């Protein structure tokens, strides 16, 4: 925690092709070692691939895939009298986006397809159709929150 108050959030500039801040955030998260050009090539290639398979506009299909992965609830550990409880909490909208982006990229990287463009496109398509690793992660998170609903009164 900084002593001089909250650190201001930096605004992410919209991406050059779709003029979307969401796409820009995704590219920044996908990037390794500052190689933004490579990350953009992967992202835009995956979107074109997704658009061909769904027949929808690329950005709209991406946003729908992202919406299908966004968690509504999560559990946070809370210590009460020596015991740690998993307390279900609602997820803030900015965190929903961050988690869904992180999960999509993580599960895309762990897929078996050849090349990151194909892996990401396949994960987008699965998320678009409510399947895949990222959607399963969201469902697991919701299941954990549901199972620990009894501890909801420990919310702070």
Curated annotation (Swiss-Prot):
GO biological process: translation
Key word rRNA processing present: no
Alphabetical UniProt keywords: Ribonucleoprotein, Ribosomal protein, RNA-binding, rRNA-binding, tRNA-binding
Molecular function in Gene Ontology: rRNA binding; structural constituent of ribosome; tRNA binding
Domain of life: Bacteria
GO cellular component, one term: small ribosomal subunit
InterPro entries given in the database record: Ribosomal_uS7, Ribosomal_uS7_bac/org-type, Ribosomal_uS7_CS, Ribosomal_uS7_dom, Ribosomal_uS7_dom_sf
Family, as annotated: Belongs to the universal ribosomal protein uS7 family.
Protein function: One of the primary rRNA binding proteins, it binds directly to 16S rRNA where it nucleates assembly of the head domain of the 30S subunit. Is located at the subunit interface close to the decoding center, probably blocks exit of the E-site tRNA.
Assembly: Part of the 30S ribosomal subunit. Contacts proteins S9 and S11.
Protein name: Small ribosomal subunit protein uS7
Organism annotation: Lawsonia intracellularis (strain PHE/MN1-00)
Lineage: Bacteria, Pseudomonadati, Thermodesulfobacteriota, Desulfovibrionia, Desulfovibrionales
Annotated gene: rpsG
């Amino acid at each position: 925690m900084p002593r001089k108050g909250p650190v201001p959030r930096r605004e992410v500039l919209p991406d050059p092709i779709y003029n979307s801040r969401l796409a820009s955030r995704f590219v920044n998260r996908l990037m390794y070692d500052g190689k933004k050009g490579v990350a953009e090539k992967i992202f835009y290639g995956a979107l074109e691939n997704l658009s061909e398979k769904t027949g929808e506009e690329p950005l709209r299909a991406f946003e729908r895939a992202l919406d299908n992965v966004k968690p509504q609830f999560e559990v946070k550990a809370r210590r009460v009298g020596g015991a740690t409880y998993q307390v279900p909490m609602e997820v803030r909208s900015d965190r929903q986006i961050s988690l869904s982006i992180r999960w999509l990229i993580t599960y895309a990287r762990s897929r078996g397809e050849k090349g990151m463009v194909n892996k990401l496109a396949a994960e987008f398509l699965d998320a678009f159709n409510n399947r895949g690793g990222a959607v399963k992660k969201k469902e697991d998170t919701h299941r954990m929150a549901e199972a620990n609903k009894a501890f909801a009164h420990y919310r702070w």
